Amino acid sequence: MTADGRGAVFALLDDCDASAARRSSRLYTGFVHERVCADAAQLEAVCEAAAADMQAGLHAIVLADYEFGRHLLDGASAPSFKTQHGDATLRFLLFERCEKLSRDEVETWLVRQDGGLAEPSVVGTANVRESVEAEEFNAAIAAIHAALRAGDSYQVNYTYRLSFDVFGSPVALYRRLRARQPVRYGALIALPGGAWVLSCSPELFVEKHGATLRARPMKGTAPRSADPATDRAAAEFLGSDPKNRAENVMIVDLLRNDLSRVAQTGSVKVPAFFSVEPYASVWQMTSTVEAAWRPGTSFAGILRGLYTGAIGWLDAASGPAGANQNVCGDFCMSVAIRPSAQADVLRGTMGVGADIVLDSVAQDEHAECRLKARFLTGAEPGFELFETLYATREEGVRHLARLSASAATLGFPFDAKAVRAQMAAQCASLPAQTAHRMRLALGKSGATQITTAVLTPLAESTVGVLLASDHDFATMQAGDPLLRHKTTRRAEYDRGWREAEAKGAFDTLFFNERGELTEGGRSNVFVKLAGRWWTPPLSSGVLPGVMRGVLLEEDTSLQAAERVLTRADVLNAEALMICNALRVALPARVIR
């Protein structure tokens, strides 16, 4: 999975503008150790120790948690706004090797880590949750407005967290985000202990190159549009809007003030004002602030002067020239998204926020935060959701509840009312008294596609099934969250029922890594043991089929229940039954 082997610590700092002539991306491998600073009083000592490591030939990157910045603030003057909890540390990761790469070389490396697939493997987010409700957001903005009126500040960045589940690998997620939003400050970092950092933020916090310090604050956002004329109009509006320009000026003034603390007197300048840049889901307004580094100011000194609580990663590639803490090498800091791995499940967090001034409207700022998050939550996962439904001209179609629930969980926009109207119109055009198979597909963008075909009767009332373990099929993984949703990521399932048809059967029954029966490629399965019908529980890795639910919850004569089942249970069963919404329930027999 990584350059050093599965589970190894590494860091990829990824510049979308890197080329063969200017290999500005960096891949750090051969992890040696880390140095962690949890106390601002120890910052200089930790930086000095890391500088000694670099003088000895190691390469360093630095990750600074959001909350660490609060340790560096002067408590007497810092506003006491409540912030999100973090581990409040700054850590140096030290590596033996640093390889410079072009953009294409980075892509080649990422492909290798993602199983050699030209297209990124299936990955995405689910169960996205905001750390604040709308009422809490509004109350926080009201409190900030009160503080602004009291003169505590004239602009405050309010940030909250999104929490989400991640299905698929962090490498695949980074590949998809990288393709969706190329940036100069991308990062994919596997940390000690199994956590990950992913960054596709376009915002530069601060960098030092030679004697130049540079910051590129972002303030001002407008939504992108698929319509070119609307998209251009949004960019033009953002560039000329007085409110956005005023807020951008405030941020620039803050950075000018911060840089002046660590710069040569009179050297602070703003070479670029109000630049409007396109990204995946938004236009962003940026400005550039530069200053001449004050000789003798250490990296720790720059942090104390500038760091106000931004989540950051740092590329200290050139590093200090020696172990003297008063010497500062080149570096580059930017904000980061941080999905973290926990056991077999990936949990992610991402900070989103807005700069609040006196005329900021809470509802508008909340909408802007959600818009900024769309580059992640709206990323294409590599599959569609779909349903295969029984349809007639007379009865229409029945179930959309499962598709609606899956769409909500996986973040697919779904207009159920509009889709029902489309399906009703499709059913009205079908021949009378003729059963049809209707397939409804839903894309990540919310686009739908409906197709129909005549439903061919089965040749036999009792159908045959194969056992996947007898025919070289893959083992299912019970913990795979996508097994709970009907998606087009089902190559093994499709191969299962097609091979079954080729052998005169209807379906293939699959098993998980624990040897538990799960489901068929296109059906759920029920097994009769000692006079009682049983079906595998969802925890075995089972799609909650519509007909399965009917048989469990509504068919009182069947009295079926859930239970972990095995291959032996299938072979020794008194009877077998498979079911789906298209064919209802069918008696089955194993073909070996």
Predicted regions located by residue number:
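Helix-start/capping segments and mature chain N-termini
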Residues: N248, M285, D364-R437, A441-R592
